[in-house]
């Protein structure tokens, strides 16, 4: 058995064919012609040692961190870009100063920039009771807002009830009137009495309180009239009140039930509105705004007289 460090008998000898010993082992002249590269005089070939090998090339470092030369823009292009950026910066600074100047002018004139935030899914109006109304008036304002939403709910249900009556043969005129009530009633209530009350609570203005009282009385009268719905316009069936409900319950039970529900909604809205105007009037008198309003009215009358 061969030892671990014995030579391999099948391994080829590491012999340099150009050495003298290799020529001696070959036993004389080779039997083949070398062609154009054959040298008859082997002494002209430089001698090499028998154990010499070809020296390997030195290892080259891997070019992982090598940089790639990227041609940079010329100094002229850099200057042009720098000028362009400076011009843009100057334009932005000019716009910022102009916007700041307008905001300051609006603030001096008492103009408040309001961001639309309600309803959340489709902002149409600015409404922020928590941050804009004093804490001791927020409960009153929330109830007034509930009365505004209650009016919208009443008019919407009125459209449903009148539509059911129209389908059962009561005529299209009452349906058109119900649509007019809804389309004009909700925005009109917001502009005529809810927004004045909101601004009066926020700014504590006696004049805006007076406007609210004047319009809100008509709102209460309309709710009471709608709850009764006397046969004044088109037999009163354009409003879901108690009288048309009694008349329709005998003809069609479903339509009569719709009208009775409308009657209940208008009753609740009337009671809620009466509570709101009572609370607002108590605050108005208790805060001295009533006396202030009287003084302002007297001054206005005297100026008009002179």
From Swiss-Prot:
Gene: SCAMP1
Compositionally biased region (Gly residues): 25-36
Location within or outside the cell: Cell membrane; Cytoplasmic vesicle, Secretory vesicle membrane
Alphabetic keyword roster: Cell membrane, Coiled coil, Cytoplasmic vesicle, Membrane, Transmembrane, Transmembrane helix, Transport
PANTHER family cross-referenced by the UniProt entry: SECRETORY CARRIER-ASSOCIATED MEMBRANE PROTEIN 1, SECRETORY CARRIER-ASSOCIATED MEMBRANE PROTEIN SCAMP
A Pfam family hit: SCAMP
Protein's membrane topology: Multi-pass membrane protein
Compositional bias ranges of the Polar residues kind: 44-54
Protein name: Putative secretory carrier-associated membrane protein 1
A Gene Ontology cellular-component term: trans-Golgi network membrane
Cytoplasmic-facing ranges: 1-141, 278-306
A Gene Ontology biological process term: protein transport
Job of this protein: Probably involved in membrane trafficking.
């Amino acid at each position: 058995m061969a030892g671990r460090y014995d030579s391999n008998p099948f391994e080829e000898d590491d012999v340099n064919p150009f050495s003298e010993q290799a020529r001696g082992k070959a036993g004389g002249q080779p039997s083949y012609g070398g062609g154009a590269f054959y040298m008859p005089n082997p002494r002209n070939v430089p001698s090499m040692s028998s154990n010499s090998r070809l020296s390997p090339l030195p290892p080259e470092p891997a070019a992982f961190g090598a940089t790639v030369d990227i041609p940079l823009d010329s100094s002229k292009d850099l200057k042009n870009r720098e000028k362009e950026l400076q011009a843009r910066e100057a334009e932005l600074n000019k716009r910022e100063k102009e916007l700041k100047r307008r905001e300051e002018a609006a603030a001096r004139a008492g103009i408040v920039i309001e961001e639309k935030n309600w309803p959340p899914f489709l902002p149409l109006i600015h409404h922020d009771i928590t941050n804009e109304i004093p804490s001791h008036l927020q409960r009153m304002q929330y109830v007034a807002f509930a009365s505004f939403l209650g009016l919208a709910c009443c008019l919407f249900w009125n459209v449903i009830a009148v539509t059911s009556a129209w389908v059962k043969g009561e005529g299209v005129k009452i349906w058109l009137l119900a649509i007019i009530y809804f389309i004009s009633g909700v925005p009109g209530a917001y502009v005529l009495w809810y927004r004045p009350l909101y601004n009066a609570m926020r700014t504590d203005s006696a004049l805006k309180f007076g406007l609210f009282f004047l319009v809100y009385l008509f709102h209460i009268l309309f709710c009471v009239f709608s709850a009764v719905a006397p046969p004044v316009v088109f037999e009163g069936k354009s409003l879901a009140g108690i009288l048309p409900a009694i008349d329709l319950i005998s003809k069609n039970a479903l339509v009569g039930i719709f009208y009775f529900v409308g009657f209940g909604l208008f009753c609740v809205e009337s009671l809620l509105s009466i509570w709101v105007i009572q609370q607002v009037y108590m605050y108005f008198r208790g805060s001295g705004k009533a006396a202030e309003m009287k003084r302002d009215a007297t001054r206005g009358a005297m100026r008009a007289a002179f």
